[in-house]
Amino acid sequence: MLTFMASDSEEEVCDERTSLMSAESPSPRSCQEGGQGPEDGDSTAQWRIQDSEEDGEEDPDRYVSSGVPGRPPGPEEELTLKYGAKHVIMLSVPVTLCMIVVVATIKSVRFYTEKNGQLIYTPFTEDTPSVSQRLLNSVLNTLIMISVIVVMTIFLVVLYKYRCYKFIHGWLIMSSLMLLFLFTYIYLGEVLKTYNVAMDYPTLVLTVWNFGAVGMVCIHWKGPLMLQQAYLIAISALMALVFIKYLPEWSAWVILGAISVYDLVAVLCPKGPLRMLVETAQERNEPIFPALIYSSAMVWTVGMAKLDPSSQGALQLPYDPEMEEDSYDSLGEPSYPEVFEAPLPGYPGEELEEEEERGVKLGLGDFIFYSVLVGKAAATGSGDWNTTLACFVAILIGLCLTLLLLAVFKKALPALPISITFGLVFYFSTDNLVRPFMDTLAYHQ
């Protein structure tokens, strides 16, 4: 039973029978104030229903455009639009920061643009004069790289399906240790060499230790949300720099195209590994490990909060034009049907919405390959700023379109295909068409 505050400050108690009242057989309406009799209630109900029917006869489809027939496009649609824009900003800012860190490092630190080795996953070299042989080697490197990614993803899904959580945690902790300690040590050393900054080894070791220890605590246990997000962006940038340095040029572009296709298949196919991982997590009502996912809101993991399952409930109210006509909430705003959730114990009612907001989640692999594309554009070929900025804008446009599709389909979608496709198209078109045109134009001026 819900109580709505009318505009004339009269309180009416509406139950299920009164909310489903029809014009053909109006049910008597009970009112608790003012001594109003049943006859007055019937006449009031009939007047409201007739008025709504007359409005419906004028234009029966006037509210269909909002997506829900018979529902006015009011504040709820505006609220949805605001949250959509907020979610775009929540993901655009960290993606932008990650790409800025990578591009700034590529433009200033020569270590990450020097080719003095390759990954074990790309054994075929591209130092051949033959274009066909170079293309073949890049395709073979791509096949090996994608095969390794597929095998490791399936292995992770199998471990998660059989609840091997300790093994997964150990795997992720070892990866985080390598990124936060070893790769950070290498990165900091090269930055200090580039800018000719002297630092003794004890200070360097202490700095790396503090950085890595705090990162391990924030990522795998507890910590402020913004600090956790900053560490996830940092490890994504470090991993992207490793790929930029050790991936051959042609192999990098072919891998970017192939990984976007694989991401499409892995997420959208019924038996795709990433889709199975997401569906398994949803069935168990468990969050995916924070070390794999960037979240714009706090991700609750096992041990961070003890919630009472019996306290979580929802009440779905049916849509009733009569209630909507002069039903107002306690703040005087029009009240629309929605899902009311019981407050969790220990949280104030006014903070419930903020605490329950899950935010938007983006895989760290998407951060890495976005940054690889922009970093390769800045490091290889002409390396001019026009090409780099074109790839940067293309990735953000693709991310916005992906979020738009996410709002439409309301299910997990791959974040790489649109952004990587736009990035590759913008890179090759800018590098081969726009840049020569601008050089010629500047020469003749």
Swiss-Prot record:
A Gene Ontology cellular-component term: gamma-secretase complex
Renumbered residue ranges of the record's region Disordered: 1-76
Spans within the Cytoplasmic topological domain: 1-87, 160-166, 222-223, 272-361, 410-413, 435-445
Species this protein is from: Microcebus murinus (Gray mouse lemur)
The protein's Enzyme Commission number: 3.4.23.-
UniProt motif (PAL) ranges: 414-416
Record's comment on post-translational modification: Phosphorylated on serine residues.
Subcellular location: Endoplasmic reticulum membrane; Golgi apparatus membrane
Biased composition (Polar residues): 19-30
Gene (UniProt): PSEN2
Lumenal side: 109-138, 188-200, 245-249, 383-388
UniProt function note: Probable catalytic subunit of the gamma-secretase complex, an endoprotease complex that catalyzes the intramembrane cleavage of integral membrane proteins such as Notch receptors and APP (amyloid-beta precursor protein). Requires the other members of the gamma-secretase complex to have a protease activity. May play a role in intracellular signaling and gene expression or in linking chromatin to the nuclear membrane. May function in the cytoplasmic partitioning of proteins.
Protein name: Presenilin-2
Main location per the UniProt record: endoplasmic reticulum
Intramembrane residue numbers: 414-434
Gene Ontology biological-process annotations: amyloid-beta formation; calcium ion homeostasis; intracellular signal transduction; membrane protein ectodomain proteolysis; mitochondrion-endoplasmic reticulum membrane tethering; Notch signaling pathway; protein processing; regulation of calcium import into the mitochondrion
Keyword Transmembrane: yes
Keywords: Endoplasmic reticulum, Golgi apparatus, Hydrolase, Membrane, Notch signaling pathway, Parkinsonism, Phosphoprotein, Protease, Transmembrane, Transmembrane helix
